[in-house]
């Protein structure tokens, strides 16, 4: 009992020899006392004298610098002290003292640390201090909180690392008015200061932020890592100051994220004191010095980074060159530091790289086997330190604490701009004083990020019960770029621009242009009129130029060029991120120009132009809970619209031709003067198994009067060829926009199978009924004017350039196999 009270005191590493003699002396007394039957008063007296002796010896102890989040230490002095001790004591049977556990970085290879922790739990060996870098910081931080090795193993089995480490976030967290442009670019540049700059990393890592904040929620009020179940430190590199920093306080989630910010891959973590942290592996990949500075006397080191790091192999490529260059100093230092460990564990990770998270379970098992292989050495070290080993795993972390509520008295938003502070506070929808849970904070973070004004949000609760929100503002001006090529309209380049607060606070200007033979241009201005961003007013301007195909016997023989200019304004209300209701009006001016081939088919002798104006009053309800814009894993999308249209008469500028030919043109191009329409679209994605998804969809389009051939619903086309939300109805088995109808209803059923990561095999069966009138559509379910049944198969792949799909399809009306190809993000 005496010994176990003493060993929790902090040792002065700079007077280590004196401490060692005193410790051995006191330990012997502790053993004698524990083995004897002594009166309680005598025991108290002896312990008091021992404590006084300790205080006298340690008067000159050097205190550890503990300001901010960075702990400094003299690495050279610690190295010399450790060398003297290890060499001077020889084979001493008694060590005593504190045990440190040091976990290296290594990306996915770092999952081997979980297996090591499981083995240590089984042996009953519990460290007094933990330090880690990169993935070692993540796993070590969770273990320091109180998670057991088995619980962390469970997290590893349940975690979707591909999603956590992806550059896209769950689309359900994006405000509805921004979903249409969300995650549709290959790269982007932002205006920071007065210069355009690329992002500081390929992955913002918001999914990882959310993951860390959720798991560390019980420690949200912890400001010093010494207050954790096991004192903890992690390393990160400050690229501005050129320093290797040991993080010992602040937000545990932020420290873990900072320590694994691989340069170029993850964006660095920028703190309030203007420090810019990157992966600690660039400077100290095996932080043994940090463990010694905390007071560790003996160290168990687990290294997963240096094995075969600099051995040549035929697959050596650019990626490995960049990784080894960035981590060169840290890896070299880790090789040297490994020799200073009392027990060094190096799992056999041959064939595993820093990115093979798909093999997480195997990597973990290799770490477990490596620790078991050194079981005797670990147990011997623990016994020499006076540990009771072999008592089994510790009590598990109570996961119910993840649901704990925390009382707050006030909310502090740490932003320089007063309007932005108010906006962030309102958007978070948090109130104080109140009790908050992690779910409340997750929802607040989603609201802030989904607004588009912030890239991520850090938070913590201080000792005065103040909730601090540190949202990272997004660049005020961003340009993003993408490309697209398909068989419907050819190749195109897509440029998007977004400006925040261009004319007033809490507003946004979006401009998107598709540069192609059939161009499109959209510009919208949105301003929020409610404190919590639920109500907004939006104005749109758009231009489109497209070719409407004219088919005869399944052949595209002619076309009509359609040029349109439109303007609309509406009031929107978003009760939640995935739902919006819009009420507004739209004006459009359309000019249609048939080509020579079209005039030949209908009997006109000269070219002509046909113009028409229209006014549309509409009310739309939209809901979208899909997880991704392309190949989602779950969710549903619903669009319901009711509209009333007023059209001007079709103005003809054709100079010659038979009267019946002009009538044909009018029936193709004209719209009725007044009518109403109802549109409904549904799409769902349901996960049947881990790699199989079922996707039913429905479409319903009704007009109260018969419309022209090119003024109604256009049916046909493969994947990703929709240019107009309501008029285009994709259908497997016929050509792009091959058929048209005044009214249509249809259903499709897709089965999507994940073959490998983002590679899918898709099969589709679809059916549609087409009619000229709304009444005719309802009366002709058994005998429609046109009944289409088709289907096909496609291979789809989510590439860095956007979704790619190659499909083949057939329908009962077409009597031919249609092949379609598409690559790139859609407009």
Residue spans for each PLM region:
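Buried hydrophobic packing residues in well-ordered domains
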Residues: 106, 136, 152, 242, ...
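Bacterial Sec-dependent N-terminal signal peptides
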Residues: 1-5, 18-73, 698, 702
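Gram-negative/organellar outer-membrane beta-barrel architecture
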Residues: 438-439, 458-626, 630, 719-729, ...
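Outer-membrane beta-barrel and related beta-rich outer-membrane complex signature
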Residues: 314, 549-551, 591-599, 650-654, ...
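Flexible glycine-/small-residue-rich
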Residues: 236-238, 347, 413-417, 471-475, ...
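Acidic/histidine-enriched alpha-helical segments
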Residues: 309, 379-397, 514, 635-638, ...
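C-terminal outer-membrane beta-barrel translocator/porin domains of Gram-negative envelope proteins
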Residues: 478-483, 608, 614-756
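Patatin-like phospholipase
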Residues: 60-133, 141-446, 450-465, 474-475
């Amino acid at each position: 009992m005496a010994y176990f009270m003493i060993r929790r005191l902090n040792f002065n590493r700079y007077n280590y020899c004196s401490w060692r003699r005193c410790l051995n002396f006191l330990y012997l007394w502790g053993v004698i006392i524990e083995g004897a039957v002594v009166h309680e008063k005598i025991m108290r007296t002896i312990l008091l004298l021992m404590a006084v002796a300790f205080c006298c010896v340690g008067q000159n102890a050097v205190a550890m610098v503990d300001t901010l989040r960075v702990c400094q230490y003299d690495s050279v002095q610690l190295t010399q002290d450790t060398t003297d001790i290890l060499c001077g004591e020889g084979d001493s049977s008694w060590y005593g003292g504190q045990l440190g556990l040091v976990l290296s970085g290594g990306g996915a290879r770092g999952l081997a640390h979980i297996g090591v922790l499981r083995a240590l739990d089984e042996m009953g060996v519990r460290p007094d201090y933990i330090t880690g870098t990169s993935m070692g910081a993540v796993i070590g931080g969770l273990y320091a909180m109180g998670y057991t090795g088995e619980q962390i193993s469970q997290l590893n089995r349940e975690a979707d690392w591909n999603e956590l480490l992806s550059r896209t976030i769950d689309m359900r967290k994006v405000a509805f008015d921004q979903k249409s442009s969300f995650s549709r670019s290959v790269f982007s540049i932002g205006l920071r200061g007065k210069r355009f700059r690329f992002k500081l990393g390929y992955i913002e890592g918001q999914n990882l932020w959310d993951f860390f904040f959720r798991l560390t929620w019980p420690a949200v009020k912890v400001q010093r890592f010494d207050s954790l179940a096991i004192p903890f430190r992690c390393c990160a590199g400050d690229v501005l100051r050129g320093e290797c920093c040991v993080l010992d306080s602040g937000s545990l989630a932020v420290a873990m994220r900072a320590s694994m910010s691989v340069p170029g891959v993850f964006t660095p973590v920028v703190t309030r004191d203007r420090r810019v942290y990157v992966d600690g592996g660039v400077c100290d990949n095996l932080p043994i010095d940090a463990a010694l500075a905390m007071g560790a006397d003996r160290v168990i080191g687990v290294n997963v980074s240096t094995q075969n790091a600099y051995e040549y192999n035929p697959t050596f490529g650019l990626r490995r060159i960049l990784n080894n260059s960035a981590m060169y100093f840290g890896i070299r230092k880790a090789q040297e530091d490994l020799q200073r460990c009392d027990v060094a564990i190096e799992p056999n990770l041959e064939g595993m790289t820093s990115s093979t998270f798909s093999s997480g379970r195997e990597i973990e098992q290799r770490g477990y086997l490596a620790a078991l292989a050194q079981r005797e050495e670990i147990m011997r070290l623990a016994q020499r330190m006076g540990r009771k080993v072999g008592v089994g795993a510790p009590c598990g972390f109570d996961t119910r604490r993840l649901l704990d509520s925390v009382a707050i008295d006030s909310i502090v938003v740490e932003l320089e701009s007063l309007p932005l502070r108010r906006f962030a506070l309102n958007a978070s929808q948090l109130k104080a004083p109140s009790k908050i849970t992690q779910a409340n904070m997750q929802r607040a973070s989603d609201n802030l990020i989904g607004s588009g004004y912030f890239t991520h949000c850090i938070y913590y609760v201080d000792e005065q019960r103040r909730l601090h929100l540190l949202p990272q503002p997004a660049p005020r001006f961003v340009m993003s770029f993408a490309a697209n090529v398909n068989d419907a309209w050819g190749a195109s380049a897509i440029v998007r621009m977004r400006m925040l607060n261009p004319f007033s606070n809490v507003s946004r200007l979006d401009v998107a242009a598709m540069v192609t033979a059939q161009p499109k241009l959209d510009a919208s201005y949105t301003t929020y009129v409610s404190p919590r961003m639920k109500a907004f007013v939006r104005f749109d301007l758009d231009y489109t130029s497209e070719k409407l195909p004219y088919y005869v016997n399944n052949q595209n023989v002619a076309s009509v060029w359609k040029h349109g200019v439109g303007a609309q304004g509406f009031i929107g209300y978003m009760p939640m991120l995935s739902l919006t209701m819009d009420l507004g009006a739209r004006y459009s001016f359309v000019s249609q120009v048939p080509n020579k081939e079209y005039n030949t088919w209908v009997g006109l002798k000269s070219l002509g132009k046909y113009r028409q104006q229209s006014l549309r009053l509409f009310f739309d309800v939209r809901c979208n809970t899909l997880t991704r814009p392309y190949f989602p894993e779950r969710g549903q999308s619903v669009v319901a619209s009711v509209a009333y249209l007023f059209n001007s008469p079709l103005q003809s500028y054709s100079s010659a031709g038979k009267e019946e030919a002009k009538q044909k043109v009018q029936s193709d191009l004209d719209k009725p003067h007044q009518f109403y329409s109802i549109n409904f679209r549904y799409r769902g994605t349901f996960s049947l198994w881990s790699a199989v998804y079922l996707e039913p969809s429905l479409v319903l389009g009704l007009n109260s009067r018969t419309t022209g051939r090119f003024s109604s619903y256009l049916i046909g086309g493969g994947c990703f060829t929709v240019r107009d939300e309501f008029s285009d109805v994709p259908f497997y088995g016929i050509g792009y926009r091959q058929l048209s109808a005044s009214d249509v209803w249809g259903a499709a059923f897709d089965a999507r199978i994940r073959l490998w990561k983002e590679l899918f095999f898709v099969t589709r069966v679809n059916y549609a009924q087409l009619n000229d009138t709304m009444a005719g559509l309802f009366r002709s379910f058994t005998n429609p004017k046109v009944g289409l049944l088709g289907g096909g198969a496609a291979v789809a792949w989510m590439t860095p350039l956007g979704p790619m799909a190659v499909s083949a399809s057939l329908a009962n009306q077409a009597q031919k196999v249609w092949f379609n190809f598409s690559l790139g993000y859609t407009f």
